[in-house]
């Protein structure tokens, strides 16, 4: 069976990808910087994984790790809405360049890259977005810029066959980002709600994203292609919140806020934090306001047609599984 290296293996998505590949008989090399977290991954359903401690931003590490590997899934990244541009460029752009060099040197058959539909984000509603429907000059935040540039690196090189996936809004057991933030906000002052929460949200159970990545490894038709990945079940933001907190046995509390005003506040906050080099993250960022206030749905027909992608965990099931794990 083929041998697959997964970068970012102990991250939220990476853990599910490792287990998905092992379940289908692949030999898996779990790559990450911290041995204790890799050991914890192996103890949590990935006993058969080989561990490789390293940093893909170090050329010697990723080159050594890719020896004897057939496929690489590059899921490692600096994924946050705020930070220094230099950090995003080093990790997400130059780090990807080093992964490509390693794959070329070791004759890896295919590199599957985890990008982000954050590149579609903006100050407007966007529905049924196709893979080509993005602005390459989008600079809403440094993360978006870095993912656009990383994709450019992959498109412009010709030495390694590549596939790019853009999974949207991952959630599930082990999530430390989207749902935990909503729960935390609800238990404090309330969840920010813009436009009555009627904006459409298109999110993805993490198990479905892991499935899509395995399919990208297996499908010859995928080489050179880009795919949107979601659950294919767009829902109003407020409806998702109601479902989530009903499953948790809690009552959602909302902070109804004016969208335009908060976008202006976020813009000013970002400038102040940059100018004075303040620690931490602004209370609101333009990206966060766009994600909470505007509709964004993705067209996944290409993934369905070419990868044979069919979500295996429904939105409702995913929410209930998460809630059960939280209780």
What are these regions (language model features)?
Residues 50-91, 102, 122:
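NAD(P)H-binding glycine-rich loop region in Rossmannoid oxidoreductase-like domains
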Residues 98-142:
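Conserved Rossmann-fold NAD(P)-dependent oxidoreductase catalytic core, especially the SDR/UDP-sugar
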Residues 125-171, 191:
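Catalytic helix-loop patch of NAD(P)-dependent Rossmann-fold dehydrogenases
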Residues 215-282, 300, 316, 320-323:
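Mid/C-terminal beta-alpha module of Rossmann-like enzyme folds, strongest
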Residues 172, 194-199, 227-234, 245-248, ...:
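Glycine-rich Rossmann NAD(P)(H)-binding loop
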Residues 4-24:
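N-terminal Rossmann NAD(P)H-binding glycine-rich loop of SDR-like oxidoreductase domains
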Residues 149-150, 176-181, 195-217, 224-228:
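Substrate-positioning beta->alpha
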Residues 57, 87-98, 145-146, 204:
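Glycine-rich NAD(P)-binding loop of the Rossmann-fold in SDR/ketoreductase-type enzymes
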